Amino acid sequence: MAKIIDGKAIAAKIRGEITAEVAKLAAQGITPGLAVVLVGEDPASKVYVSMKEKACKDVGIFSDEYKLPAETTEEELLQLIDKLNKDRKIHGILVQLPLPKQINTEKVLEAISPEKDADGFHPYNVGRLVIGKPLFQPCTPYGVMVMLKETGVDLAGKEVVVVGRSNIVGKPVAFMCLQQNATVTLCHSKTRDLAAKVAMADVVIAAVGQPEMIKGAWIKKGAVVIDVGVNRVGEKKLVGDVEYEAASARASAITPVPGGVGPMTITMLLYNTLESAKRR
């Protein structure tokens, strides 16, 4: 059976380090500040925002929440972002996605100052990531890389197969693996013979949002499996993008769902906010 990569335990360790760093800054009169902007009443978004608020409080980061009505105009949101860009108490800005349809998401993300882009989605930060000189790295893929490092996985020379090419996870994590000298294959909906691609991987990173799409039988014996997917099946069951039980029988290490990558995402958001405050 595979070793379980415990995201909760790794996140707790990193948060302990963040708490200590925040306390050091506080002794110098600096409190890292994160502004979280929520537009509308999306239930999942409200849950995520409250989790981020609690996480900030737990490590000593100042959290400023802006909850705007669903009918907020694009111009009103851009004005708020401009104000937050100029606010010296704020070191990180996060706009919770998805946004209502009357607001252009791309325009909003581009309006955030690259130096306060705690989510790492600004084109400037994406470009820096691609050339190997990152300022902010997107939180979920960053969390994946930290998990691999903490598990003792050296990517140099390894075959890494990333399934899913989203701008939020798939593409950035592929570039991050490339910078660690892995040989990366990025698979997507038009990829031919996905099973054969996955079967050659030393490390599989699944981020497609399709319940148990990647079959356990595809996994090479001894491979490491990182499952970013969180999919609801029925009323209460959560599953990943990988067939967990069958994959566990073949993999050397695997992340569970829930309790794997999820806890790392908010942890890396806290880390990005801390790093921004240290740069000031």
UniProtKB/Swiss-Prot annotation:
A GO cellular component term found in this entry reads: cytosol
Annotated pathway: One-carbon metabolism; tetrahydrofolate interconversion
Molecular function via GO = methenyltetrahydrofolate cyclohydrolase activity; methylenetetrahydrofolate dehydrogenase (NADP+) activity
> Per the UniProt record, which EC number(s) apply here?
1.5.1.5, 3.5.4.9
Do you know which InterPro entries this protein is assigned to?
Aminoacid_DH-like_N_sf, NAD(P)-bd_dom_sf, THF_DH/CycHdrlase, THF_DH/CycHdrlase_cat_dom, THF_DH/CycHdrlase_CS, THF_DH/CycHdrlase_NAD-bd_dom
Known catalytic reactions: (6R)-5,10-methylene-5,6,7,8-tetrahydrofolate + NADP(+) = (6R)-5,10-methenyltetrahydrofolate + NADPH; (6R)-5,10-methenyltetrahydrofolate + H2O = (6R)-10-formyltetrahydrofolate + H(+)
Give me the residues that bind NADP(+), please.
Answer: G164, R165, S166, S189, V230
Keyword Thylakoid belongs to the record: no
Per the entry, what this protein does is: Catalyzes the oxidation of 5,10-methylenetetrahydrofolate to 5,10-methenyltetrahydrofolate and then the hydrolysis of 5,10-methenyltetrahydrofolate to 10-formyltetrahydrofolate.
Query: Under what name is this protein listed?
Result: Bifunctional protein FolD
